[in-house]
């Protein structure tokens, strides 16, 4: 088959872009011709349609008025007429651009509804679809319109219940909710990772650290998520701050890799920044807690291959998000053979934890204090004690990362994706 994977954007480091690339790799291996279709001209995007993405002024205009209240139109009717006009334009563009494809795989276009005209136009194509839903509009408060008519559009069409559409979700919570809300059946396809070989090596560990001018014996915690408030990165700062304080007596002791601990702990940000104000707050908070930050977000934005390279520099990975649809950076850490400190968000507990990973827990409850997310001090202290043991025990460190790598290979690999696609998804 000739297959189009379509999204607002592609070739970036967000979860949807990454999963599309994995689907493309697996589907191509299965013998299909696969193209990624998006608005932006990035490496990895095979067909560019400038009308479907964030940079299209109509996208921004529709999104602002649909979700934030009518501001740019005289009446609801005028705005709905504009929506219909854009739908017609997009229908003709899509009908022509996608005419030669046998299967269309929209990613989040029908589940978030960020550009309703696009979703409505897409549903009119006489094609076979596999709708890949990573997130749903009802999971995001800012995507639930106050306007009754607009809410009805989302309730009825996002996602559409059509005989030519098969639905895929990424976790069992979303599967149950889609069934409850719309009586739509779906297949759970977890996020996956290439576990054919580790993405790090001892040689690269030393080389990357040398390039970054990180002194030998420095402990590096890696925060690889995008910089966004939903990732609650302040918890990583709390972890690193307490870890450094706890390890005062360990200076010159042998780390898991044979190096002598220098007394320094660094928190490295490798994810692209999507909230400059939040990054500023994190820098101020880190300074107040005595935590050294190394922020390489801009460098990664310019060169995405650097993102993967930076896993080599880490001694452990922090993953403190309180809300995730799945957990790409968790799988990346496992593939990189790095221990993980994580907050037990709902999807982790329902879909990932049963696989049997070994991890350092920040619990599953949090609270806000002065605008920042916090966990109980006793849980934080226990987590730091566990990290300390890992970092200074070569056998425990090796056993933990090797165990997790095997779990990842068994449950969350490209081979697992191929199996689900062939048995449960493809027509």
From Swiss-Prot:
Any GO molecular function: glycosyltransferase activity
Sorted UniProt keywords: Cobalt, Glycosyltransferase, Magnesium, Manganese, Nickel, Transferase
Annotated EC: 2.4.1.-
InterPro entries: Glyco_trans_1 (IPR001296), manno_glu_gly_synth (IPR054975)
Entry note: thermal dependence: Optimum temperature is 60 degrees Celsius.
Main enzyme class: transferase
Cofactor(s), by name: Co(2+); Mg(2+); Mn(2+); Ni(2+)
Keyword Heme attached: no
Assigned protein family: Belongs to the glycosyltransferase group 1 family.
Protein name per the record: Mannosylglucosylglycerate synthase
Organism: Thermotoga maritima (strain ATCC 43589 / DSM 3109 / JCM 10099 / NBRC 100826 / MSB8)
